Curated annotation (Swiss-Prot):
The chain crosses the membrane at residues 26-46. It comes from Eremothecium gossypii (strain ATCC 10895 / CBS 109.51 / FGSC 9923 / NRRL Y-1056). It is found in: Endoplasmic reticulum membrane. Belongs to the short-chain dehydrogenases/reductases (SDR) family. GO terms for biological process: fatty acid elongation; sphingolipid biosynthetic process; very long-chain fatty acid biosynthetic process. NADP(+) binds at residues 72, 126, 153, 225, 229, 258, 260. This is Very-long-chain 3-oxoacyl-CoA reductase. The lineage of its organism: Eukaryota, Fungi, Dikarya, Ascomycota, Saccharomycotina. It catalyses: a very-long-chain (3R)-3-hydroxyacyl-CoA + NADP(+) = a very-long-chain 3-oxoacyl-CoA + NADPH + H(+). Keywords: Endoplasmic reticulum, Fatty acid biosynthesis, Fatty acid metabolism, Lipid biosynthesis, Lipid metabolism, Membrane, NADP, Oxidoreductase, Transmembrane, Transmembrane helix. Pfam families: adh_short.
């Protein structure tokens, strides 16, 4: 018969064994979760590399290219919108060019018709004015034409970074009217035609909307613009679910800076492509997420933007305090430089 000390000793061993089992189980769980996370991270990086360098470009025949189909592009007179029009025409789409400056639209129309031998038509409208007649005119422009592609490119931002409380009512309303109201109204006008034409031509329809890193990351000193683009992300993803049963693909395209009048950046770099390079990557990546690995119906197509998006999303997080603070400092610096430049110009005029 064992002593009490022997019984206590064995009880202690059993307790240690039980604890070791629990500790080992926790360690294995942690290891498994870490391994899965690391594997997912590496596979996503490989996916980004393949999608930006190796995989073939998307085919546009399924949207009616070279079959008489039309693509409607808003904000088509300059920058990214102009490149969408040119590159869609090069793929065999007839194009409908909608923007404010008629002279630029007519010049682009002649260039497209001469270079790509497709039909091009123009409509000059001011999306900054919320007028129902604008959307009636767009409906009449489309008429009986087989429009299967809509590119929502039109957009505006703040003239310079500014705090929300100092943003003028005119600028605030202008941003919401162009970025949100106009985009929704154009889509509500054109998407039913896209659905009907896709069914009639036995092809798919496409609705592309230009988003921004300003909507991906809450951006201090661009609060209204940032909110307007974040709205488009949620709206576009919801619309994708609604139009999928109608054989219409919906995707929002996210970009960081691109050389353009809106960004006020003139020199291209590895992180800041030209509109031509950005649109080329967008059209090549259609239907893929590239840098937007965890976001439905979303694409961050340009290679450096894709890496930037993916790393932010998987490290500090797009809604983190750190990302917000970095964004604030970045745009505060831009504001200081813009104000100094304005002061110099004012001084030069007085002289």
């Amino acid at each position: 018969m064992g002593s009490l000390s022997d019984i206590s000793f064995f009880d202690h061993l059993q307790e240690l064994a039980r604890r070791d089992c629990c500790v080992n189980a926790l360690l294995w769980c942690a290891f498994t979760v870490g391994a899965v996370k690391l594997t997912t991270f590496m596979l996503s990086l490989i996916s980004i590399a393949l999608e930006t360098t190796v995989l073939p470009s998307a085919s546009y025949k399924k949207y009616g290219a070279r079959k008489g189909a039309y693509a409607l592009v808003t904000g088509a007179s300059d920058g990214i919108g102009k490149e969408f029009a040119l590159q869609l025409a090069s793929k065999g789409f007839n194009v409908l060019l909608v923007s404010r400056t008629e002279a630029k639209l007519l010049e682009l129309k002649q260039e497209i018709m001469a270079k790509y031998k497709v039909d091009a038509r123009v409509l000059s409208v001011d999306f900054g004015v919320d007028n129902r007649l604008t959307y009636t005119a767009i409906s009449e422009l489309c008429g009986e034409l087989p429009v299967t592609v809509l590119v929502n490119n039109v957009g505006v931002s703040h003239s310079i970074p500014v705090s929300f409380l100092e943003t003028t009512e005119e600028e605030l309303r202008g941003i919401i009217t162009v970025n949100n109201t106009a985009t929704l109204m154009v889509t509500q006008t054109v998407a039913p035609l896209v659905i009907a034409n896709a069914r009639r031509l036995q092809c798919r329809g496409l609705v592309l909307t230009m988003g921004s890193f300003g909507g991906l990351l809450p951006t201090p000193l661009l609060a209204t613009y940032s909110g307007s683009k974040a709205f488009l992300q949620a709206w576009s993803a919801a619309l994708a679910g609604e139009l999928a049963p109608h054989n219409v693909d919906v995707q929002i395209v996210l970009s960081y800076l691109v050389t353009s009048a809106m960004s006020k950046v003139r020199r291209a770099s590895a992180l800041i492509p030209t509109p031509r390079a950005f649109v080329r990557s967008t059209l090549a990546s259609l239907g893929r997420r590239v840098g937007a690995q965890e976001r439905y119906a979303t694409c961050t197509p340009y290679w450096s933007h894709a890496l930037y998006h993916f790393l932010i999303e998987n490290t500090v997080g797009v809604h983190s305090r750190l990302a917000n603070a970095i964004n604030y400092r970045f745009h505060a610096d831009i504001r200081k430089r813009a104000l100094r430049k304005a002061a110099r110009k004012a001084a030069e005029k007085q002289e």
